[in-house]
A protein has these predicted regions:
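Ligand-binding pocket scaffold of soluble enzyme catalytic domains
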Residues: 16, 47, 56, 95
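Short loop/turn segments that connect beta-strands within beta-propeller blades
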Residues: 48-52, 124-128, 168-173, 214-217
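A flexible loop/linker signature enriched in serine peptidases of the S9 family
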Residues: 1-11, 27-43, 56-92, 104-121, ...
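Generic structural signal for coil-to-beta-strand starts
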Residues: 22, 43, 101, 151-152, ...
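Non-catalytic accessory segments flanking enzyme active sites
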Residues: 1, 13-19, 23-28, 175-231
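Structural WD40 beta-propeller signal
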Residues: 18, 97, 147-149, 190
């Protein structure tokens, strides 16, 4: 009775194949009726194509959600004040690291709060632990992609009304890759070149495709416009 992608806005970004093609990570909100209508608690599930087993990567085995009083706001209820990290908000858009050792996704902290901050969560298959690598970034993550060596993640984040590109390693050290009065989007790695492809627009220019060449740590990336479709 459940769907993936999630309605009404979800797309193919809400599921991902593992590099070895043996597993599928997918986004799903496994609730029905009133719970489905009120809750924003979607999780990332891992389906093993060989065994047929499904594992919830967001919650511990046997987890049972606290009872909810639907006549009151969820903000003050137990579901949002549990011991430990129960991932009760939106968890969406999984991406496996190229080496298959991690899977990352966007995660909101609170249930019932659709405007919560999107954090970037990285799950390690080695120890089953989650690490929110953008906790030090005081804003939301829009989209992201892994580097080919699986050591870093590039993401687009909003700061001072601009969408720029940032980089984080797996320990949560965040660095700015671009610093422009513009909005980047649709971020992807360009093969094994180490470069990125992204869209970019500003108050003076519509969307075009840009090549973004990251530099050594501590230096900003060099962006080169590739298309002029809207000139």
């Amino acid at each position: 009775p459940y769907e993936c992608p999630g309605e009404p806005f979800g797309g193919t970004e809400q599921l991902a194949w593992s590099p070895d093609s043996k597993k599928v990570a997918y986004t799903c909100r496994k609730k029905v009726g009133r719970e489905y209508a009120v809750s924003t608690d979607s999780d990332i599930y891992l389906y093993d194509t060989e065994s047929g087993n499904t594992t919830n990567l967001c919650k511990p085995d046997g987890y049972k959600a606290p009872a909810i009083d639907y006549t009151k706001t969820l903000a003050t209820q137990q579901v949002n004040h549990q011991d430990g990290d129960m991932s009760v908000g939106y968890d969406i858009n999984p991406q496996f690291s190229p080496d298959g050792k991690h899977v990352a996704w966007l995660s909101m902290k609170q249930d019932g709060y659709e405007s919560d901050r999107n954090r970037l969560c990285v799950y390690s298959f080695a120890d089953g632990k989650k690490n929110y690598v953008t906790d030090s970034f005081d804003s939301a993550v829009e989209t992201f992609c892994w580097t080919r060596d699986s050591h870093n993640i590039y993401f687009i984040g909003v700061w001072h009304a601009c969408l720029n590109i940032y980089r984080t390693d797996l320990t949560g050290k965040v660095e700015k890759a671009t610093d422009e009065i513009a909005d980047y989007g649709s971020l992807q790695m360009l093969g094994n070149t180490g470069n990125l492809i992204a869209t970019r627009h500003s108050m003076s220019a519509p969307d075009d495709i840009y090549l973004v060449a990251p530099q050594k740590k501590g230096k900003l990336a060099v962006s080169t416009r590739l298309t002029k479709e809207n000139d």
